[in-house]
UniProtKB/Swiss-Prot annotation:
It is found in: Cytoplasm; Endoplasmic reticulum; Secreted. One of its GO terms (biological process) is cell redox homeostasis. Residues 81-239 form the Thioredoxin domain. Its EC number is 1.11.1.24. This is Peroxiredoxin-4. The active site is at 126 (cysteine sulfenic acid (-soh) intermediate). The lineage of its organism: Eukaryota, Metazoa, Chordata, Craniata, Vertebrata. The keyword Secreted applies. It comes from Rattus norvegicus (Rat). Its main location: cytoplasm. Homodimer; disulfide-linked, upon oxidation. 5 homodimers assemble to form a ring-like decamer.
Length: 273
């Protein structure tokens, strides 16, 4: 303020206005430069945090030589997959029992379907998930549920991975279909495709026997999913479908459920105290 007073002191009002007009451009330029620098610092912080999503335990989760593209971007497509709405339709070529077959969502009408995406064949966490679900497929079938895994790899890459022994990072004989999404359309419809990375996040979708989407789980790259939790969720949704009651936190088959009305809920909460 003192500087401004010295500059304007001893001048007539008209001269003061002329001096102000001359001083405004450099002042505005200074303010714009300051704001731009703050914006760059903010972008740098964002990029640093974004890159951290791809680094784990001292190394890249999916190195550049594997994904072939920069791992700095997490851009996702707007998902068509919405809870309580019909699941986005899909069809494509899958590897089933070592053979190429055409597969589509409507093949599973009348059954529950666990439909999950994994990033890439011949990677690290992915085979552990597929093997875990495949080894326990009979538990899913016993509750009228099927499991399908999907990635952006071709059916030929799927087959090569299946033909690779497990001790070498392969799948070996696998009991669930591996669906190919080579044009990325299915991944985009389900909102799991990372545009600049060229592969998907770990998305899992539970679709009921009427084709309605009931549950979505979406993991970042470093962490695999739980077969036990997926089974529990399917069983919980099937129970509510059949009985009309609702399942509290951590519910398992045989546990108490809640009647969803003001009087009915008291039967459940009275037993807790």
């Amino acid at each position: 303020m003192e500087t401004w007073s010295k500059l304007l002191d001893g001048t007539t009002p008209s001269r003061r206005w002329r001096k102000l007009v001359l001083l405004l451009p450099p002042l505005l330029l200074f303010l714009l430069q300051t704001e731009a620098l703050q914006g760059l610092e903010s972008d740098d912080r964002f990029r640093t945090r974004e890159n951290e999503c791809h680094f784990y335990a001292g190394g890249q989760v999916y190195p550049g030589e594997v994904s072939r593209v920069s791992v700095a971007d997490h851009s996702l497509h707007l998902s068509k997959a919405k809870i309580s709405k019909p699941a986005p339709y899909w069809e494509g070529t899958a590897v089933i029992n070592g053979e190429f077959k055409e597969l589509k969502l409507t093949d599973y009408r009348g059954k529950y379907l666990v439909f999950f995406f994994y990033p890439l064949d011949f990677t690290f966490v992915c085979p552990t998930e597929i093997i875990a679900f495949g080894d326990r497929i009979e538990e899913f079938k016993s509750i009228n549920t099927e499991v399908v895994a999907c990635s952006v790899d071709s059916q030929f890459t799927h087959l090569a991975w299946i033909n690779t022994p497990r001790r070498q990072g392969g799948l070996g004989p696998i009991r669930i279909p591996l669906l190919s999404d080579l044009n990325h359309q299915i991944s985009k419809d389900y909102g799991v495709y990372l545009e600049d990375s060229g592969h998907t996040l770990r998305g899992l979708f539970i679709i009921d026997d009427k084709g309605v989407l009931r549950q979505i789980t979406l993991n970042d790259l470093p962490v695999g999913r739980s077969v036990d939790e997926t089974l529990r969720l399917v069983q919980a949704f099937q129970y509510t479908d059949k009985h009309g009651e609702v399942c509290p936190a951590g519910w398992k088959p045989g546990s108490e459920t809640i009647i969803p009305d003001p009087a009915g809920k008291l039967k459940y909460f009275d037993k807790l105290n």
